[in-house]
Amino acid sequence: DCDGQMNLTRFYLPEFDPAVNYSMASLLMGDGEPVWEDNLVPLEPGLNLIPGSPDLYNLDLDAIKDGVSAPENVRNFVDCVREDDGADFFIFDCPPGFTTASVGALMAADEVVIPMLVDGFSFAGTQDMAQQISNLRRANQGVRIAGVLITQWHNSDVVRQGEQLLRSMGVPVFQQTIRRTDKVPE
């Protein structure tokens, strides 16, 4: 969980206390456990989590203040896991901005899925993200956009037109969408 808001962590681990447990912030600061498996919280067989932490916000502030950032620690962690054949894939839940943790995730990623609500701000954000991923290829030549995943889709003219516009932008778009439902916020 690369987001200081910790929604993914709170969903899976409502009682998680980042003050006494390792987190993505620990990993980025180089304070994680030396054995990669000890940084994971097992959720189910084959599903593990490196929890988020509000310390991720402090990490970004420290990086600005001190000019020190360690996003390569995420790539080093992923490389260690891959060397041991310890995971089939990684999913990094990132905030909608370029934080230290999200840059670390992008440096370690092979493919990026961009979830997108069809609205004007999201089109600009998707274009910005595509450009940033292109720029990031200097540090990670293998990263590419797997596709944009349209979220909160519903059958309306505005959404259908937005979807057509998105498909004309030259960014891959998944055929599958995530429908809008009132049940999720409840």
Regions found by a protein language model. Give the residues of each.
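P-loop NTP-binding core
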Residues: D1-E186
